[in-house]
Every structure is written in C-alpha cells, then in structure tokens.
C-alpha cells in the first residue's frame, strides 16, 4: 500500500446483483467484482460469480451486523466488494453501510430492485406504486395498505 493510500479512509464497493447473476451485470459491475481482493455476500450471491474471479469469497455470518460495523477496515489494503440483492440502497446492505460509515466510504453500483422489476412486469409506474417494506419491521405496517377503507 502506498503512503498516500494509508491516509485515505478505507472504501467498500457494493454491487447489486439480480437473480440473473453474472449475465445481468453491467460492465462496470463486472470490472468491480473482477478487481476485488475480497468478495462479501450471501452464499447464493457468491455462487453467482464465475469461478475465474480470483477474489477471496467470504459469506456473511448470521447475524451480519457486527461484520458490517468492522467494514471497511477489516481488510486493510484490500479492494473489498460487497454483493447485494438488486438495489443495495433499497432496504439493503448499501443503506446499512452508508449509515454506519458515511457516503464517503461506500461506492454503490446498483442493479434494478425487486420493486422496479415487479412494476415493469405488471406495467405499473414505479412513482405511482406504494411500496411497504417489512424488512426488519412488523407485518402490521402492511395492514393499512391491504385493507379497505
């Protein structure tokens, strides 16, 4: 590591990946993954990356919260790429990392979210669609949106 790199805060790149895996990634997302020294993600996400990618693959433990706190400094000098489902900034790991470490420590390369994909399939305008996330929240939040009146 160069001396000027030691003075910079460690950065993490978060890459959104869809169910279509490697084939659905943009060239920018592929380059980020191919250039990684360390890949973090779920076992399923890591399995979507071709074996030719030489990065060390580390699946998230459960719970993954303590590991997120340690990123990005857990792998000094390494290019760390975190794989995320769809859009990492829609109730995803990208949001968590930015909250923990600030936007200056995280680069995000998004993929279409499940919301965007569902709206496209149904022909609905995303901006006219109510989205209720129950990720880490009570299912009671859904009730007002699915009951009459």
Identify the meaning behind each predicted range.
Residues 117-123:
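Structured adenosyl-cofactor binding patch, chiefly the S-adenosyl-L-methionine
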């Amino acid at each position: 590591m160069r001396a000027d790199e030691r003075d910079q805060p460690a950065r993490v790149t978060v890459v959104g990946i869809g169910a279509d895996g490697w084939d659905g990634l943009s060239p920018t997302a592929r380059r980020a993954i191919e250039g990684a020294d360390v890949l973090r993600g779920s076992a399923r996400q890591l399995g979507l990356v071709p074996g030719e990618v030489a990065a060390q693959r580390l699946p998230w433990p459960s719970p993954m919260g303590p590991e997120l706190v340690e990123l990005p400094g857990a792998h000094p000098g390494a290019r760390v790429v975190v794989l995320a489902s769809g859009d990492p900034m829609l109730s995803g790991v990208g949001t968590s990392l930015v909250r923990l470490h600030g936007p200056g420590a995280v680069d995000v390369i998004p993929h279409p979210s499940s919301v965007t994909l569902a709206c496209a399939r149904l022909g609905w305008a995303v901006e006219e669609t109510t989205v209720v996330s129950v990720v880490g929240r009570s299912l009671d939040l859904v009730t007002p949106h699915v009951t009459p009146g």
